[in-house]
Amino acid sequence: DQKGKSPESECNKISEEPKCNEDKICSWHKEVKAGEKHCKFNSTKAKEKGVAVTQTQTAGGTEATTDKCKGKLEDTCKKESNCKWEGETCKDSSILVNKQLALSVVSAAFAALLF
């Protein structure tokens, strides 16, 4: 039962390379900084093995990109590379690109599972 335990902490408990690499969500790192564990959580490996990976993303990251376009006048908005004028407001168009990129990554991972 892994409820309440982070995948990273579960991997950090493993101290032997073969056991770490056998785990569905962990990978062994030969060179680490002093005080760091060799066995670490690997989200790419976890996704490939079909393990559900919870995304730890803070809302602050998306707010920062949205705010850079907020409140700009139409002319200024249209000149900015990641902004677009929509209706009566200036909006961040990079969020849409990020969502499309995330969707294509998920689609590619799913297709890889089928073959």
UniProtKB/Swiss-Prot annotation:
It comes from the Eukaryota. Residues 93-115 form a propeptide. It is a lipid-anchor; GPI-anchor. The keyword Mitochondrion does not apply. GO terms for cellular component: plasma membrane; side of membrane. The keyword Ion transport does not apply. Keywords: Cell membrane, Glycoprotein, GPI-anchor, Lipoprotein, Membrane, Trypanosomiasis. Glycans are attached at residue 42. A lipid is attached at residue 92 (GPI-anchor amidated aspartate). It is found in: Cell membrane. InterPro entries: Variant_surf_glycoprt_trypan_C (IPR019609). VSG forms a coat on the surface of the parasite. The trypanosome evades the immune response of the host by expressing a series of antigenically distinct VSGs from an estimated 1000 VSG genes. This is Variant surface glycoprotein ANTAT 1.8.
